[in-house]
C-alpha cells in the first residue's frame, strides 16, 4: 500500500492548511458574534436595518497566479510597474450591493467619511450600521464624529478578526473571478475589471455570492 492509499483508507483527507490571525482572541470573537453581530444581522434580514461590512483592499497590478485545468503549464505575462488600485468598499449584508470609494493613491480617514456620506445619502429608509475593523484611519475621533452626524452606527470588530468581516470573502472572490491567471495590458483595464466585478454582485454573480456570503462565521476555537 502507498502512503496515500493508507491515509485515505484511514479517513485522512488531503487538505491545504489554513491560517488564523496570530493575535486573535477567540472568546472576544464569540461574545461579539453572539451579543452584537448576530442581533444587527437579524434586524437586517427582517428589513429593519441596513448593515454593511466595510474594508479596504489594495489591488496591485501584478501577476495573480492561480490553478488551471490545462494540458501544459500556462505562463501569464507579468505587467510592468506596480500600480495600485485602492478600493474602500461597503458590502450590504443582505442584498450584497457594494458601495465603493476608489483611488490610485491611498485610503485615509477622509476616504472613509466620503464613503459614509455615500451610504447615508443612498440608504435613507432605515437605520444604518457599519461593521468595520480597528484600522487607525477608521477608528478615530474624526470618523466617529462624522458618522454620528450622519446617524450611522459604527460597530467595530474585535482586534484581529477578519473572519468576522463578510467583505473579506468578497475580496477573495474578486481576485479569483477577474484577476487570477489573467493579464491586463494597461492599468485602466485592470481597474475596469475590478469595478465591473464589484458592480455585478447583485446580478451576474448573485448566485455564486448567495452561498459565499452567508451569515455563517468561522470561529477558531480548535487550532493547533
Pin down the residues of each PLM region.
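Short functional hotspots at interaction and active-site rims
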Residues: 1-224
Amino acid at each position: 500500500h502507498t502512503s496515500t492509499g493508507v491515509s485515505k483508507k484511514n479517513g485522512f483527507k488531503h487538505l491545504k492548511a489554513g491560517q488564523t490571525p496570530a493575535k486573535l482572541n477567540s472568546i472576544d470573537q464569540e461574545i461579539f458574534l453572539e451579543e452584537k453581530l448576530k442581533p444587527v444581522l437579524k434586524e437586517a434580514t427582517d428589513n429593519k436595518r441596513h448593515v454593511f461590512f466595510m474594508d479596504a483592499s489594495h489591488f496591485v497590478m501584478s501577476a495573480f497566479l492561480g490553478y488551471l485545468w490545462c494540458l501544459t503549464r500556462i505562463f501569464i505575462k507579468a505587467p510592468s510597474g506596480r500600480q495600485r488600485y485602492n478600493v474602500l468598499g461597503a458590502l450590504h449584508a443582505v442584498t450584497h450591493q457594494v458601495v465603493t470609494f476608489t483611488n490610485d493613491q491611498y485610503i485615509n480617514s477622509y476616504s472613509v467619511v466620503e464613503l459614509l456620506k455615500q451610504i447615508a445619502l443612498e440608504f435613507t429608509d432605515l437605520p444604518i450600521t457599519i461593521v468595520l475593523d480597528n484600522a487607525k484611519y477608521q477608528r478615530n475621533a474624526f470618523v466617529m464624529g462624522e458618522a454620528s452626524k450622519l446617524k450611522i452606527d459604527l460597530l467595530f470588530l474585535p482586534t484581529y478578526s477578519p473572519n468576522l468581516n463578510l467583505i473579506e470573502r468578497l475580496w477573495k472572490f474578486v481576485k479569483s473571478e477577474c484577476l487570477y491567471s489573467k493579464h491586463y495590458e494597461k492599468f485602466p483595464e485592470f481597474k475596469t475589471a475590478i469595478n465591473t466585478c464589484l458592480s455585478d454582485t447583485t446580478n451576474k454573480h448573485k448566485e455564486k455570492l448567495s452561498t459565499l456570503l452567508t451569515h455563517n462565521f468561522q470561529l477558531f476555537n480548535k487550532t493547533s
